[in-house]
Amino acid sequence: MPTRVCCCCSALRPRYKRLVDNIFPEDPKDGLVKTDMEKLTFYAVSAPEKLDRIGSYLAERLSRDVVRHRSGYVLIAMEALDQLLMACHSQSIKPFVESFLHMVAKLLESGEPKLQVLGTNSFVKFANIEEDTPSYHRRYDFFVSRFSAMCHSCHSDPEIRTEIRIAGIRGIQGVVRKTVNDELRATIWEPQHMDKIVPSLLFNMQKIEEVDSRIGPPSSPSATDKEENPAVLAENCFRELLGRATFGNMNNAVRPVFAHLDHHKLWDPNEFAVHCFKIIMYSIQAQYSHHVIQEILGHLDARKKDAPRVRAGIIQVLLEAVAIAAKGSIGPTVLEVFNTLLKHLRLSVEFEANDLQGGSVGSVNLNTSSKDNDEKIVQNAIIQTIGFFGSNLPDYQRSEIMMFIMGKVPVFGTSTHTLDISQLGDLGTRRIQIMLLRSLLMVTSGYKAKTIVTALPGSFLDPLLSPSLMEDYELRQLVLEVMHNLMDRHDNRAKLRGIRIIPDVADLKIKREKICRQDTSFMKKNGQQLYRHIYLGCKEEDNVQKNYELLYTSLALITIELANEEVVIDLIRLAIALQDSAIINEDNLPMFHRCGIMALVAAYLNFVSQMIAVPAFCQHVSKVIEIRTMEAPYFLPEHIFRDKCMLPKSLEKHEKDLYFLTNKIAESLGGSGYSVERLSVPYVPQVTDEDRLSRRKSIVDTVSIQVDILSNNVPSDDVVSNTEEITFEALKKAIDTSGMEEQEKEKRRLVIEKFQKAPFEEIAAQCESKANLLHDRLAQILELTIRPPPSPSGTLTITSGHAQYQSVPVYEMKFPDLCVY
C-alpha cells in the first residue's frame, strides 16, 4: 500500500522535478544518467521559463546532499548544472543564474577542498559564458572574498594547499573576466575588492623561488604551467587585471601593491618589487604610465623618514618605471618627478650631515658610517633616476630640466636657488652641490643643441661658472664635464680624452663646422667668462690629474666648436698667461701644480697650432716641445702625470728656450694674416661681484704682479732690463699714489665693462641724464655771471613774482672806511 501511495504521489509531481530526479541514479558511483539528462536538457531548452524552477530544485537537492556529505550526488548535481549552462541560450539563462550562484556559494562554504575546487570550476565555466545584457543587480562580493581566502590557503597537505590556491586564483580570474568588461558595473574596482584581489595575487607570485627577470612582455606559458604553478597563474591573472584597468580605476589597482610591499617589507631587497612594477608598466595602457609614476612618487613622499635602504628600493622601482614610461607617454609629470627627486636628494644629504654631526665615538661611529653608506646608495639611486629620465626626454623638455636643476644649485651670494639648505651647513651644502651637478651631468649627456646659445644661455652659464662652484676639485670637475656635454656637438670629446702631446691632430679626424653668427656672438658676450673660469681653475691648489685633463679638453672644445681668428688669439693669450703664472708662482702653488700647468699649456698650444695650420707657429711649438723632451720632461703631460716623476726644485733658472715666447708666436701668426696686436697685452681675468663677496683671493692683486714682472721672467730678444734708483722720496710717492691708481684702474675697468655688456638703451639713457645735468649746471653758471652784483645803492625785492630795486639816498649809503677821506 505505501508503495502504491508513493507511486501515485510521484506521478502527481511536476514534470521538471521528475526529470531532475531521474538524472540521479540509485548508486552515485554510476554517475549521471545520460539519457535522462538529455531529456532534462531538451525540456529546459523547449521551455526556458522553467529554468529558474529547475535551478531552484537542483539547488535544494544539492544543499541537502552537501549537509549530508553525499559527495557523489553533489558531483552529479554540479555536472547537470554545467550541462544546462552550456546548452541554454544566453537570453534564457538569467533566471537560472541566481540558483546556480547560490549552489556554487554552498560548495565554496563547505570545508571540503574537493567541493571547493568543484564549485570554482563551475564558476569559471559560468564566467566564460558571454551574456548579451549583463545583470546589474548581480554582485560578486562573496566570491571575491571567498576566492581571495582560498588564495591564502594554509592546508597541511602541500598538494591540497596548492590545489586550493590554484582554484582561488582561477576563481578571481573568473570574477575579473565576468565584471571588468562592463564599465557600468565597475564594483570590482572598488578599493574594498582590490584590497583583497591584488594582495592575493601578489602573495602567490611571491612564492616563486627565483624571481623572473624578464623585462618585456612575457612569453605565453604552457598549459601545464598555468594549471600546476600558482605563481605563473597569479602573474597572468595580475597582468589581465591591469590590462583591463581604465583611467578612473588605475590607482585603485596599484595602491594595494604598495600596501603589500610595505607589510611584507619587500623594498629591501627589492627584487620582487621591481618585478611587480615591471609587470604593471608593461600591462597597463601606455597613456596611463604617468599615473603609476605619480603613485610611486607619492609613496616615496609618504616613506621619506624610513630607513635609507627602503627609500633606495622605492627609488630603484621608480627608475624601472621611468625607463619603461619614457619610451611612450610620460604625461604632465616631468617637473613633478624631478622636483620630488631633488627634494629627496636634499633630505638624504641632510640626514647624512646630521648623522655625521651626531656620531661621536665607538660603536656610534660604526653605526654612523653604515648610515652614511646607505644614504649614498639613496643619493646614487636618485641621480641615476634623474639621469635616465632626463636623457629620454626631448630636447625642448631637457633644456627646461637643465634650467630647473641649475636653479636648485646653492650659489654663494645669491638667493635664486629653491632648495632649503639652512640645515645643511658647509659640508652639506658642498655635498648637495656635488649631487645636483652629478644630476645635471646625467641630464646633459647626449644633448645636442644647434647653437651654443641654446645650450648655454646666460641664466644657465652664470651660476654654472660661479666661483662658489670652484671651492672643491670635484665641483670643478663636474662643472667642466657639464660644459663638455653641452659644447661637444660633434662627438669629438672621446678623441680628446687624456692630456697628451698629439703628434698629428689630423689622425684624430676631428669633426667641425663653420662657426655660425650666433656662436660668434656668444663668444663676444661670454668668452671672457669662459677664459676666466679656465684660468682660475688651473691655479687651484687641490687640482688632480683629472682637473688638468678636463681643462685641456675645455680649451680644445672651444677651439673646435667656437673659435674664429679672434677667439684663437684670446686662447693663445690665455695659454701664455697660464705659463707666466706658473713661472711667477704668485699663488705659491706646489711644484707639481706648476709643472702641470706648463704641461697643459704645451699640450694645448701643440693642438691649436695644428688646428690653425700656421707653419711658423707649429715650428716654434714643436721646437719648444723637443727641447723640453730632452732637458725638462716634467713640463710635458706624458711625464708629469706619471707616477714617481722627478720634479725640479725651481723654475727660475730655466732657459727661455723651454718657454713659449709671445714675440715668436706673434711674429708667426702675424705673417699669416692674424691680428696679433692683442698678443702683446697680457691676459687679465675679469673681476666679478662674487669675487669681492667670496673668500677667494683678489684677482686684481693677483694680476698686478704678473703685469709688472712679466718681461723679467720670460726673456725675449728685444727686452732690456733697466735699473732704477730707489730713494725714500720715490717710495713715499709710490705709497701715496698706489691707492689712487688702483681706484682709477677700477673706474676704467667698470666703464669698459659697462660699455661691453650694458644694453644700448641703458647707455643712451644714462648719457642723456648726464647731458641734462650738464645743461642745468651751465644754466646756473650763466645766470650767476650775467646777474649784476649787489649795489650799495639799492636792494632787490620780489613782489608778485617780479624783481624790483629800491634806491637808497646817498647820505644813507655805507662806504668802506678806506674809501672815505
Curated annotation (Swiss-Prot):
Subunit (UniProt): Component of a phosphatidylinositol 4-kinase (PI4K) complex, composed of PI4KA, EFR3 (EFR3A or EFR3B), TTC7 (TTC7A or TTC7B) and HYCC (HYCC1 or HYCC2).
This protein's membrane topology, according to the annotation, is: Lipid-anchor
Q: Does the keyword Cell membrane apply?
A: yes
Stated name of the protein: Protein EFR3 homolog A
Q: Name one GO cellular component term.
A: presynapse
User: One GO biological process from the UniProt record?
Assistant: synaptic vesicle priming
* Family assignment from sequence similarity: Belongs to the EFR3 family.
Pfam families from the entry?
EFR3_ARM
Positions carrying Phosphoserine are S360, S363, S422, S694
State what this protein does. Answer: Component of a complex required to localize phosphatidylinositol 4-kinase (PI4K) to the plasma membrane. The complex acts as a regulator of phosphatidylinositol 4-phosphate (PtdIns(4)P) synthesis. In the complex, EFR3A probably acts as the membrane-anchoring component. Also involved in responsiveness to G-protein-coupled receptors; it is however unclear whether this role is direct or indirect.
Q: Keywords in UniProt for this one?
A: Autism, Autism spectrum disorder, Cell membrane, Cytoplasm, Lipoprotein, Membrane, Palmitate, Phosphoprotein
On the tree of life, the source organism's domain of life is Eukaryota
Where does this chain mainly localize?
membrane
Q: Which InterPro entries match?
A: ARM-type_fold (IPR016024), EFR3-like_ARM (IPR049152), EFR3_Homologs (IPR051851)
